[in-house]
C-alpha cells in the first residue's frame, strides 16, 4: 500500500542570514555563468515538480565552531613563499575549518648555524589561532648548513640522519627550538612530507637521472630521532608519522614502516590518498593501515593529511572533489581530513605559471578571490561540526519507477555511495554517484527509500546542494506500507549527481540557530 502526499509548504525566512548579494555575485558571478552547465539547478534540470528553492546555506567563521575534523593545507610558505598568507587568511577566517597544515621551513628559519628566526612563522601561527584554526607542523625539509650536497629543485629533500652526527645534531636542535618556541600554541608535529615520493631521497640520486627514495627503515630512524627530541621539550605533544603519498599502491612501504617500529614513536599516522576517484582503493588501504596499527598494540589515530585537486579549467571539478574527499573520510571514520590546499601557488613551486590546487584563486596577485570549492567547504563546515556524528541509517537509492529486481540496467550505471550522520536528533543523509571527477555526468532521476530511525526528527525534509549552497524544500513523498516489509518513506523524482547531496530536516537551520553568530564578511 502506497499513499503519496503533498508536504506542507514552509520557509526558512527569518532563520537564515540575509543574502549578501555582493559576496554571492563575487563567488557565483562570472564563474557560475561560465560553468553553469556543470552545476545543478532544480528548475533547469527538470526537478521543479519535486524541489522548491527556499534559501542559501549559511556559513560560520572558524572561530564560532568549537571543533570538527575538517582541515585545509597551508603548505609551501617556507623558503618558497608560494603565496600571500595575509590575503589568504582573510578568506580562511570564514571557511569554518578547524585545522591548518604548515611546513616548518628549516631552510628559512635557520640560515646561520644555531640562530633561528621564527618571526615569519609566528605571524602565521598567531593569525590562525586568532581565527580559531589549529595549526599543525610538518617538520620539513632539510638544510644546506648540515648537508654537504647541493639542493634538489631548490630544497634539501634529504634525511638529516644520513649526514652523520652533524646532520642529526642540527636537526635535533632545530626540532627542539621549534617545540620550545611554539609551546602552548602548537602541539602537533609531523615528521617530514611524503618520504616515499622523492621528498626523502638518497643524496646524489638526482644526478643519475632517477630519484631514489630512502627505505622505510631510514625514515623510521628520522621519526625516532625527531620524536625523542621533541618530547624532551614537551612531553604532551603529538607526533605524526607516515605522511605517505598514495599515488600508487604503497602497502609494502607502509608494512616496512611498521616492521621498523614506527608505532613506538608516533601518536598519529598520516596518509595522502591521491586518486582521480577519491573513493577508489582508499577504504582497503585505510583498513590495511588500521590492521598494522592493531598488530602494534598501540592507540594511534589516522589523519588524511593532504589531498586535493587542481581546477583543470573547471572550478566545478575541484569543488566536486572537495565534497567527495571530505565525505569519504568522514564516513570512513578518519580522525582529521585536510584538503590541499588553501591558495594557488604563484612562486617557488613551478618555474612558470600558477599551480591551481588552491580553493583561493591567486591568478591576480593583487586580488585573491574564492573559488567554488571555497563555498563548498563552507557548506561542509556548517554541517559537520563537533555535534555531527556518523551513524548507521536505513537509506536506499533505486532507479526511478523501476525496482532493482525488475531492471536490466547495469548496477555500475547507478551504483551510489550512501551514508548517514546525526546532529542531535536531526538526520543527515548523503548520496551520490562516484564517477570519475573529469567525466561528464548528468543529473539522474532516482527514488529514495528510507526508514527514519526512532530518534530522528524528519517532518520537514529539505535537500542541500553544498556546491551551489542552495536549500530545496521537498514537495512530495510517498508513505509505503507492506505486510512483508513494514512501513517506509519514499521520495520520487529526486536528483542524483556525481557529488554529495544532503537530505535532512529543515529544523537543522532553526533549532538553536540563535547561538550562531553570523559575522560580517571580511573577504569581499
Language-model features: locations:
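C-terminal beta-strand-rich structural cap/linker in extracellular carbohydrate-active enzymes
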Residues: 473-524
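Surface-exposed beta-strand/loop patches in extracellular or lumenal glycoproteins
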Residues: 435-457, 495, 511, 516-518
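Active-site cleft segment of glycoside hydrolase catalytic domains centered on the general acid/base Glu
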Residues: 82, 149-268, 272-291, 311-327, ...
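Catalytic-core region of carbohydrate-active enzymes that cleave or remodel glycosidic bonds
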Residues: 264, 274-351, 362-380
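Aromatic-lined carbohydrate-binding surfaces of glycoside hydrolases
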Residues: 103-110, 137-154, 195-197, 246
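Aromatic- and carboxylate-lined catalytic core of secreted/periplasmic carbohydrate-active enzymes
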Residues: 6-22, 31-56, 326-442, 456-462, ...
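Mature N-terminal, pre-catalytic/accessory segment of carbohydrate-active enzymes
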Residues: 1-98, 105, 505-524
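Catalytic domains of carbohydrate-active enzymes, especially glycoside hydrolases
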Residues: 83-107, 123-127, 131-140
Amino acid at each position: 500500500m502506497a499513499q503519496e502526499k503533498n508536504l506542507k509548504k514552509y520557509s526558512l525566512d527569518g532563520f537564515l542570514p540575509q543574502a549578501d548579494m555582493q559576496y554571492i555575485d563575487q563567488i557565483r558571478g562570472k564563474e557560475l555563468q561560465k560553468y553553469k552547465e556543470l552545476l545543478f539547478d532544480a528548475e533547469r534540470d527538470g526537478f521543479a515538480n519535486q524541489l522548491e528553492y527556499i534559501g542559501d546555506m549559511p556559513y560560520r567563521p572558524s572561530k564560532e565552531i568549537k571543533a570538527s575534523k575538517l582541515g585545509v593545507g597551508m603548505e609551501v610558505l617556507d623558503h618558497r613563499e608560494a603565496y600571500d598568507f595575509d590575503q589568504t587568511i582573510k578568506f580562511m577566517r570564514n571557511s569554518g575549518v578547524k585545522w591548518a597544515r604548515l611546513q616548518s621551513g628549516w631552510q628559512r628559519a635557520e640560515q646561520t648555524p644555531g640562530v633561528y628566526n621564527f618571526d615569519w612563522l609566528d605571524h602565521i601561527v598567531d593569525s590562525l589561532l586568532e581565527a580559531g584554526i589549529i595549526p599543525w607542523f610538518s617538520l620539513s625539509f632539510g638544510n644546506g648548513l648540515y648537508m654537504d650536497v647541493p639542493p634538489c629543485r631548490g630544497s634539501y629533500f634529504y634525511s638529516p640522519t644520513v649526514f652523520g652526527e652533524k646532520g642529526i645534531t642540527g636537526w635535533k636542535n632545530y626540532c627542539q627550538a621549534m617545540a620550545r618556541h611554539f609551546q602552548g600554541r602548537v602541539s602537533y608535529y609531523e615528521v617530514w612530507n611524503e618520504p616515499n615520493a622523492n621528498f626523502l631521497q638518497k643524496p646524489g640520486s638526482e644526478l643519475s637521472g632517477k630519484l631514489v627514495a630512502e627505505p622505510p627503515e631510514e625514515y623510521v630512524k628520522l621519526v625516532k630521532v625527531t620524536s625523542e627530541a621533541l618530547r624532551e621539550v614537551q612531553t604532551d605533544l603529538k607526533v605524526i608519522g607516515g605522511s605517505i603519498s598514495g599515488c600508487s599502491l604503497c602497502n609494502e612501504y607502509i608494512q616496512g614502516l611498521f616492521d621498523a617500529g614506527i608505532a613506538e614513536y608516533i601518536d598519529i599516522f598520516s596518509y595522502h590518498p591521491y586518486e582521480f576517484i577519491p573513493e577508489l582503493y582508499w577504504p582497503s588501504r585505510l583498513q590495511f593501515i588500521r590492521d598494522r596499527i592493531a598488530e602494534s598494540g598501540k592507540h594511534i589515530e589516522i589523519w588524511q593529511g593532504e589531498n586535493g585537486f587542481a581546477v583543470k579549467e573547471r572550478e566545478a571539478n575541484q569543488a566536486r572533489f572537495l565534497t567527495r574527499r571530505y565525505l569519504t573520510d568522514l564516513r570512513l571514520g578518519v580522525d582529521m581530513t585536510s584538503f590541499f590546499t588553501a591558495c594557488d601557488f604563484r612562486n617557488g613551486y613551478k618555474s612558470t605559471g600558477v599551480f591551481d590546487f588552491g580553493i583561493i584563486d591567486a591568478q591576480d596577485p593583487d586580488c585573491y578571490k574564492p573559488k567554488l570549492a571555497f563555498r563548498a567547504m563552507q557548506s561542509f563546515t556548517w554541517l559537520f561540526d563537533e555535534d555531527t556524528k556518523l551513524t548507521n541509517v536505513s537509506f536506499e537509492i533505486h532507479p526511478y519507477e523501476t525496482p532493482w529486481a525488475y531492471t536490466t540496467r547495469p548496477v555500475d550505471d547507478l551504483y551510489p555511495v550512501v551514508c548517514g550522520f546525526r546532529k542531535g536528533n536531526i538526520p543527515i543523509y548523503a548520496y551520490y554517484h562516484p564517477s570519475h571527477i573529469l567525466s561528464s555526468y548528468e543529473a539522474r532521476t532516482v527514488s529514495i527509500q528510507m526508514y527514519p530511525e526512532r530518534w530522528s526528527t524528519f517532518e520537514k525534509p529539505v535537500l542541500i546542494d553544498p556546491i551551489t549552497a542552495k536549500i530545496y524544500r521537498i514537495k512530495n513523498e510517498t508513505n509505503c506500507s507492506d505486510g512483508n516489509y513494514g512501513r517506509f518513506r519514499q521520495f520520487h523524482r529526486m536528483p542524483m549527481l556525481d557529488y554529495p547531496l544532503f537530505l535532512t530536516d529543515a529544523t537543522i537551520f532553526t533549532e538553536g540557530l540563535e547561538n550562531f553568530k553570523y559575522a560580517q564578511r571580511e573577504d569581499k
